[in-house]
Amino acid sequence: MDTNADETAAASTASEAANATPTSVAFTEQMTGFFVLGAGDPRSAYEDARVRDERMMFELTITAPDIDEFVSGDEHEGTAAGYLDSDALGGRLPVERGWFNLFVQSGDLDERIMKYRLWLTTEGGSAVTFVGFKDVRDDPGFDLWDDTTTLFVQVLDGHVPPGADVAATGLLDPADPSVLGAGVLRIRPLDFAEQMTTFTTTGPGGAQAIARFGGLFLGRLWSTYGRLARQDDA
């Protein structure tokens, strides 16, 4: 019996199995801000909601189930799970289904659109969809920190599925009757630093997977904050 051959074959099989196992990356994000019903434009709605002290926040775990597909795919699609808490919508609402997309403009990492879509049901039993986007530009003419930490949001009537246009923000015209309300959420600096420590992985090559995801998600900010998310491979 050729023991060496058996050991070599077993090692090869194990290596192939490891390579076939997708590596996932996940992190937890918390954003807070203000939201008001009866408005459609996030910026003006934010000011109105702030005066009224109509608060909104969410805590979401964003997951890329397969880092290879997430990085190479056109839609860079992941999942979002967690909850949203809104004064205007009746309190804390669990996310029934959630999407996260990161669209890279023309393959240029200096311009990215991050999109969030959450299906929720209000305390009164109404189905609604939370949609939000960050427009992130790394060029010197824009405030990169503000872009990365600001989410413009609307809440739509019903459970609305994602559209086919991956480059679109997901928000509707402010005058669209489907828009129930709008506002703006932000990440505070200390919360952002805490967010960077929540990165986890499953599967092989965890440290490399986090670096690939982080570079795509944060662009130039990754060189500053990526050290907080470092993970040593076992």
List the model feature ranges, each with a label:
Residues 2-234:
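Beta-strand-enriched cores of mature, soluble protein domains
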